[in-house]
Amino acid sequence: MSQLQVSPSHIAVLVPSVDKAAKQLQKFNFEIGLKEEFQETFEIYVHGEKRNSLLLMEAKSSGSYRKAIEKRGPGLHHVAIDVLNLNLFLDSIAGSGWLLNLNSIKTIEDYKTAYLVRPGFPAIIEVQQKDTLPMAPFFIESLTAPLSAQQLKMVNHIGLKDIFQSHRDFTIHMNNQTLNLKELF
């Protein structure tokens, strides 16, 4: 397992409608951020100022997010983590089973961000280099997903053993509340 410090940043869920998903979360009295528009997505952060927030993403009519939702449907898109030194982190996971997405060649240089993937793994792992790592309590306490023993080992290797747990359904445990991801669709 990596000896490097890792801090969960956010968990992103690709949904058909960020407005509908945000409305579903209002019953929990979560802090729902403003809807933002980007080149390929509409996005809303839930408890965006807290460590390990929830990011709701809606694909626009074209682009990579639209292709993702058409291919796999709505659901978990990525889990973002922060590290102090991206190159040391990437060196530390050599041989762990994670693969570096080809887009990372450009994003490592331009944005100090890498994308880890693995066929069959239900999400992308976004690794961002930061100057400091927050130590505040988590908003998202855990995420359950149908993971194999090998996938759990890979998750542990990148410092997410406290976030990911294996279960047959995708659920998020936030601020003492449990939500099946399907409720956001």
Q: What are these language model-derived features?
A:
Residues 103-105:
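Internal, conserved structured core segments that host functional sites
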Residues 34-46:
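Long, hydrophobic/aromatic N-terminal blocks
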Residues 39-42, 108-112:
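Short acidic/glycine-enriched loop/turn segments that link adjacent beta-strands
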Residues 1-9, 13-34, 48-101, 116-185:
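Glyoxalase I/VOC metalloenzyme domain signal
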